[in-house]
């Protein structure tokens, strides 16, 4: 791929499409939205408004990381929106995975439209990539930036990366000068930790899975492993364990670590036993609500990478 030519073409397309108007971008800090943001910033400069929505479903330290990186280091117009209560309220009592994704997508776009009106933006730029719309089209699962979009969107949509796969986006991000901490980040689902909690999403469940997820990422990095994704899932199943001399019913965490090139297929990683033991020990020691840790050895297919 000639990335120089690709960037020239996309910058020209965005500039011609947006004209003298303003645009907002769904910025999450992941490689997809970050790369789309840099492309758009090259095209329209200060008329790009990066909107970061704290859904309450983000990784540990994510809000601080995004603000520091894009406001302080890249000098972008960054609008921080704390919408945690709104998302938790919308998901109250919801257990169906597909419904969860669609609700998150709907609320996400509602928040954007509100910010866009204040800014006077007419365009919404998203970091949608090929696997997102392929899986949505094939009815495998809805992606919040595809299937969750309302039919009557009040913003005109621009998706400059929609024909690229994840490995290509990483190459493009590197070409654009994004730091390694961005272009080598593991993929993170648009709905965030909400799809790593099986069943109803609550602040308490998110707190547990967020801590477990951080431990998995830390131990994988410490071991020098380079998986496609490594994360924790709260299964919503309590099992019996022993605490001192008494029986205790505690939560169960599943650990998922996979290798892949583009996310369309994936293999469970053959992780050294001592790494898995360390992960299990830390999760059960540092998160008192968890009493059992499982390792998922299923490939994609038949399973998807995420549990929901």
UniProtKB/Swiss-Prot annotation:
Cited InterPro entries: GMP_synth_C (IPR001674), GMP_synthase_B (IPR026598), GMPS_ATP_PPase_dom (IPR025777), NAD/GMP_synthase (IPR022310), Rossmann-like_a/b/a_fold (IPR014729)
A GO molecular function held by the record: GMP synthase activity
UniProt: ATP binding residues: 28-34
Gene it is expressed from: guaAB
Keywords: ATP-binding, GMP biosynthesis, Ligase, Nucleotide-binding, Purine biosynthesis
Native species: Pyrococcus horikoshii (strain ATCC 700860 / DSM 12428 / JCM 9974 / NBRC 100139 / OT-3)
Oligomeric and partner information: Heterodimer composed of a glutamine amidotransferase subunit (A) and a GMP-binding subunit (B).
One cellular component (GO) term of this entry: cytosol
Reactions catalysed: XMP + L-glutamine + ATP + H2O = GMP + L-glutamate + AMP + diphosphate + 2 H(+)
Name the record gives this protein: GMP synthase [glutamine-hydrolyzing] subunit B
Tagged with keyword Secreted: no
Domain of life: Archaea
Enzyme class: ligase
Pathway participation: Purine metabolism; GMP biosynthesis; GMP from XMP (L-Gln route): step 1/1
EC number: 6.3.5.2
Entry-linked NCBIfam families: guaA_Cterm, PRK00074.1
Function: Catalyzes the synthesis of GMP from XMP.
Pfam families according to UniProt: GMP_synt_C, NAD_synthase
All copies of domain GMPS ATP-PPase, residue ranges: 1-185
